[in-house]
Amino acid sequence: MFLLSLAARFVWIAAGQHNFNFVDLRVYYEAAQRVADGTLYDFALTDYTPQQPLPFTYPPFAALCFYPLKFLPFPVVAVAWVLLTAGLLFLVVRMSLAILAAGRGAPSRLGDVPVEHALFWTAGALWIDPVRTNLDYGQINVVLMALGVWAAYLIARTEAGPPALVLRPQRVDGASGALIGIAAGIKLTPAVGGLFLLSRGRPWAAVFSGLTFGATVGFSYLLLPSETRRYFTVLLGDTGPIGDPAKPDNQSLRGAISRFAGHDVGTGAAWMVGLAVAALLLFAAWWVVRRGDALIALVLVQLLGLLGSPISWIHHWVWIVPLLIWVVHGPLGRLGDHRFSGAGAGYTPWSTALAGTFVVVGLVGVHYTDDVLGWLGLSDGPVWALFMAQGLGAAIGLIALILAQRRRLQAVV
């Protein structure tokens, strides 16, 4: 089933509206060509999106990571990128299930997770809107998610105690912190993972993540001093080259509020109040599950980052995959026992209903919903804005489930 789904994705990418152009991957590829000539932040790709030029907006460390791509022809890079994304998605699914197993004291090595479960999830996840757009555009978000989930997996197995350990406890802080720091060095926003480390009582891991991020900046400055200075003193925080925050593609809190308001609200009072409310609700949800598995803690932290960021494009929301896994296989889930085949200790039908809603909305996605609403004459206004707030809706749904079922959760975690 997984191979059939992956083959269908290749056909979709080649024959669909994006016609195998991988616009974001082409930006990475072009950045790799320009690493050494001092023009890393002076180009913008226009061949495939003339209406919206695409510059390279990541830190210089990301360009250094992409540098090996310059030695390969682009078609090879494109095919390899799809295979890498699918493979890492499978790894994310498997690690997520292992984290849940560790949280309830079951065997939690990757080999203890049934392969058929992980393949089934991966086959379906390839068609969820955020993953689908990552594959269409050649985006890097699944790679970054894999680094974050890997860090959580190391911590979860340490929390489970012997014989689950894969590293000595004193080395887990360094390894998990380094993974978060490397991800932040590539794209900045994964730095929110430091809050996850703190939420699991790992202050030294958070310190290591900061030190690792600093090392990526220092390494970049050593090799690309002018580009590094320019990025961190001039370009950082400038969302202009990235796009309009009010576009439906932007699923951050700022994007959702802006669509209801009919204009970009920026970082003014409406955004600050909304962010404060979102942070408070996410903290309340975390407080309920703070003694539970590491997966839900990681998901809640990532939701804070996605909602709080000025721009969170659809393809940034790949965290919907571990979110769905927790809803289905967590303590409230229909398949939440230690074998991932029976009801969890706190099972509630509401988790099944929520998972089904997430799947349907995720498979349809923002763009197709927007097309249908446009056909119905609802291309703006509050109804349109409501249906476009799918990321915010996912966060609200998860928070509501946790808070409504807090007694069940507190009894089993």
Which residue ranges define each predicted feature?
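Membrane-interface alpha helices of multi-pass inner-membrane proteins
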Residues: 173-197, 301-308
